[in-house]
């Protein structure tokens, strides 16, 4: 009833309020879609969220705003903004603006009205009525010696007026909560009721409102009246609020009118004024709360959690696809739990690495259980689809190996003969290299599809990996072979058998380098790795370094410690490692490897595969020693001879690229007291350098979210691991000191280097995107294709999952940005009617990105930019998709995602 009457509004609507730096757009779309679905199933269509509510994340991404716009939202409100940015916006009434979130999608599809709130999401000073606060309650009994209504209302009015002065309308929003507030919600609301009734408490309140109003463009301001963990005694809080509203509105001569409201009502009041608004086209990273507190540490905190989340998404997508393609029944609950586990992982204190250790452990446990159950789904689906389940023994089962990141798989290690099934979740054929941990020294591999014996190479598992604490594997080698032309949404199966011959493992060679026609890779006298491009004037030196984390008492800015949130190096440069290691080289027909040891706890394997154009850096860091009582933050640096003029590029949540310029912000004059951490940005998928004169490009792709920068021209720096001994006092309450099996945590990960001269941009960028997508392959154990035909190389099936009432949710996306390629950046049309091999489409409905509203019914508020804004040429609205003469054509423009709900007719497997 409350929702249907508009008295209770659902905002945000995702499974959690996600982080915006370390999350991938694929997981963001998923967790909003599932949250919307549960809201609709529970409350009906009136509960459909229309407002983005990102009040606590530590910086805001442009892609997040773009996704909100594509979900049909009317606007977005957030709480945290860089202190210098906020000062300028307050002084210029620019706290509210139109965020132009995608130059590719344009105004109609990606512009989003955005409000930066005055006091994050907390109440005005002196007006927190929660049991966690000590602010004076509202006492309106005139016979009480503690009567304070007149004074308290004066205070409140001053605050409201101050806030309103910074905004462009007469509407402001006052937040009235905070961390851990509302534990006694009745008490909190009792005081809020009094505040609203009584506003000298009233004059204070009015003064605050006037202060806030000066920062905003209209005469509407929003006053938030809560905080974390507030409203635990709601009656007390609302009792005070009722008084505050009552006495404020009764005040003679007051220009402030206070009402209970919602974010949507607030935006509606602004929209009704038909004003023009300033615009913004970049993002809000990095976020600093003071001159020495740059919230860039969490870009890299808890790197194993970040990797595990990415692996979880890969497995979830494979599970959903296989359930759809095989029409598998009775697994709704398992998928539901998996979706929800992944939704929790997107939280701004989950994948960010800013939770306590025991909470991180619990998140990982929940995700592991979901992935383990997903293994059963995958096994059942593959068995059904391939026919192996019915044609083999009842004990048929496919095992998923969740410890391949430490080169461990119990099934392959203990079996002399086994089958490996490789599933391709992409929309076109791919070839990839498979690595299977084994104990033996000689193996043969045969394709079960065409009987071909691919070339096999046996390489040793690096010594550092074999010594990882807690690794119980007996595998000492890996079988490496190329799985060629795995069909789109399809599988290939390989039989792997141990041979009698022994001693065929690749042995270290006396060569001092590895090379192919593109690269020559060696180790220099300093122990750094050098990469030389054979046919181009391009060189890279790759090295490892560490920062000493600052330690202080956190009582003032200058004494801030480096911690889970904050990256603050003690010194102005990273320290070099003393090279005490060595290297070994292994060459074979499939892969060449350089095993490079820096010291006892830093090493890597550098690989070039026979038919690939990238270089793979498989790094291993830890346990980071802290017996010297010094916290350390480990980075790798790729130093090139490119001339980059302070400029580099990073992705936004794995999607569009943003230009970054060292020591610069596009919208204010930056004063930088922390030149290292203040130049760090989130790297979800890729960081890029360009030499415009030479037309050379260097890309580093990552396998998890990391913090990165270009601190010198031609350099890329990425943070791999952090171990710190002091908390930064921003909420975790413990140092970021991860341990496992009684030692410091060991982290293993991969970077993919791809670069060279850009001649044919289509070919260059397509190779790069294929590499990024192949990192999503879930290497499991399989013989058919879910597609009758491959999609064009610039089109990807983002979502294929079972939906409601036997329908299917399908998303198609265009992978290229405008101007990123030549032919590949053009609009592309695909016919999806006979695309899928296991079903045909009987009806199709297009929805907003969140799949909770028909696209034709979505009519978001329209907002006008200021006259000095550059108006983009708007193309015609997207074509309606339907079935015409047994054809379903879908037109995709650059960076466009289109979402459909399908009813289908199944075909026999």
Language-model regions: role of each:
Residues 96, 442, 509-511, 528, ...:
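Short, acidic/polar N-cap/turn motifs at the starts of alpha helices
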């Amino acid at each position: 009833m409350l929702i249907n009457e508009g008295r209770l509004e659902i905002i945000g609507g995702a499974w959690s309020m996600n982080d915006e730096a370390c999350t991938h757009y694929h997981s963001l779309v998923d967790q909003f879609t599932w949250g919307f679905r549960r809201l609709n199933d529970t409350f009906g269509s009136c509960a459909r969220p229309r407002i983005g509510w990102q009040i606590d994340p530590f910086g805001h991404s442009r892609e997040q705003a773009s996704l909100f716009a594509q979900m049909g939202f009317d606007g977005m409100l957030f709480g945290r903004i860089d202190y210098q940015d906020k000062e300028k916006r307050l002084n210029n009434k620019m706290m509210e603006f139109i965020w132009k979130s995608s130059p590719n999608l344009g105004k109609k599809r990606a512009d989003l009205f955005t409000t930066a709130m005055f006091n994050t999401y907390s109440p005005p000073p002196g007006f927190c009525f929660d049991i966690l606060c000590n602010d004076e309650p509202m006492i309106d009994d005139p016979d009480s010696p503690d009567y304070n209504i007149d004074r308290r209302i004066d205070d409140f009015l001053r605050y409201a007026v101050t806030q309103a002065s910074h905004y462009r309308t007469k509407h402001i929003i006052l937040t009235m909560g905070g961390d851990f507030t509302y534990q006694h919600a009745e008490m909190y609301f009792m005081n809020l009721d009094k505040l609203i009734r009584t506003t000298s408490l009233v004059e204070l309140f009015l003064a605050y409102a006037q202060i806030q109003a000066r920062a905003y463009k209209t005469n509407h301001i929003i006053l938030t009246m809560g905080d974390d963990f507030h409203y635990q005694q709601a009656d007390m809080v609302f009792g005070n609020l009722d008084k505050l509203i009552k006495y404020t509105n009764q005040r003679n001569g007051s220009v402030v009118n206070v009402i209970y409201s919602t974010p949507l009502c607030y935006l509606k009041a602004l929209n009704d004024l038909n004003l023009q608004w300033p615009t913004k086209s970049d993002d809000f990273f990095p976020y600093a709360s003071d001159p020495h507190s740059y919230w860039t540490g969490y870009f890299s905190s808890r790197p194993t959690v970040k990797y595990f989340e990415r692996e979880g998404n890969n497995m979830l997508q494979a599970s959903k696809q296989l359930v759809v393609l095989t029409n598998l029944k009775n697994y709704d609950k398992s998928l539901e739990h998996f979706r929800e586990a992944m939704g929790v992982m997107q939280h701004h204190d989950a994948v960010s690495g800013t939770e306590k250790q025991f909470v991180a452990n619990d998140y990982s446990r929940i995700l592991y259980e979901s992935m383990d159950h997903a293994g059963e789904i995958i096994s059942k689906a593959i068995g059904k689809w391939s026919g192996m389940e019915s044609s083999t023994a009842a004990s048929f089962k496919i095992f998923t190996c969740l410890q391949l990141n430490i080169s461990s798989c119990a099934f392959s290690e203990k079996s002399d003969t086994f089958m490996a099934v490789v599933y391709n979740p992409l929309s076109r054929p791919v070839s990839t290299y498979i690595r299977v941990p084994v104990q033996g020294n000689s193996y043969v591999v045969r394709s079960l599809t065409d009987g071909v014996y691919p070339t096999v190479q046996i390489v040793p598992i690096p010594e550092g990996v074999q010594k990882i604490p807690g690794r119980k594997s007996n595998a000492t080698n890996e079988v490496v072979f190329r799985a060629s032309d795995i069909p789109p949404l399809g599988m290939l199966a390989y039989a792997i058998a141990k041979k009698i011959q022994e001693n065929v493992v690749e042995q270290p060679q006396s060569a001092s380098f590895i090379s192919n026609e593109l690269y020559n890779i060696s180790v220099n006298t300093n122990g750094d790795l050098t990469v030389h491009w054979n046919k181009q004037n391009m060189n890279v030196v790759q090295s490892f370094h560490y920062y000493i984390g600052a330690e202080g008492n956190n009582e003032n800015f200058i004494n801030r410690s480096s911690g889970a949130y904050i990256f603050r190096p003690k010194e102005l440069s990273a320290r070099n490692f003393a090279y005490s290691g060595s290297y070994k080289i292994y060459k074979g027909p499939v892969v060449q490897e350089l095993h490079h040891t820096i010291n006892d706890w830093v090493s890597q394997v550098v690989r070039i595969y026979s038919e690939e154009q990238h270089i793979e850096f498989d790094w291993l860091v830890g346990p980071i020693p802290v017996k010297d009582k010094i916290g350390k933050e480990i980075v790798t640096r790729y130093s090139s001879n490119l001339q980059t003029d302070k400029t580099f590029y990073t992705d936004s949540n794995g999607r569009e690229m943003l230009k970054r310029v060292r020591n610069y912000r596009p919208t204010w004059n930056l004063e930088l007291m922390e030149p290292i951490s203040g130049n760090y940005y989130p790297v979800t998928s890729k960081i890029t350098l360009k030499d415009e004169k030479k037309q050379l490009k260097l890309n580093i792709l990552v396998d998890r979210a990391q913090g990165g920068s270009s601190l010198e021209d031609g350099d890329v720096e990425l943070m791999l691991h952090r171990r710190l001994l002091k908390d930064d006092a921003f909420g975790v309450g413990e140092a970021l000191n991860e341990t496992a099996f009684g030692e410091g945590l060991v982290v293993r990960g991969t970077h993919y280097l791809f670069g060279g001269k850009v001649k044919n941009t289509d070919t260059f960028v397509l190779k790069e995107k294929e590499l990024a997508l192949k990192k999503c392959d879930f290497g499991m154990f399989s013989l058919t294709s879910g597609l009758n035909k491959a999609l064009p190389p610039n089109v990807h099936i983002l979502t294929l999952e079972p939906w409601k009432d036997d329908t299917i949710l399908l998303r198609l996306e265009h992978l290229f940005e405008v101007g990123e390629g030549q032919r590949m950046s053009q609009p592309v049309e695909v016919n999806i009617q006979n695309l899928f091999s296991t079903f045909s489409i009987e009806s199709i409905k297009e929805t907003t990105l969140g799949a909770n509203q028909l696209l034709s019914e979505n009519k978001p508020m329209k907002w006008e930019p200021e006259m000095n804004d550059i108006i983009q040429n708007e193309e015609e609205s997207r074509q309606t998709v339907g079935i015409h003469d047994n054809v379903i054509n879908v037109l995709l423009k650059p960076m466009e995602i289109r979402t459909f709900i399908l009813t289908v007719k199944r075909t026999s497997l």
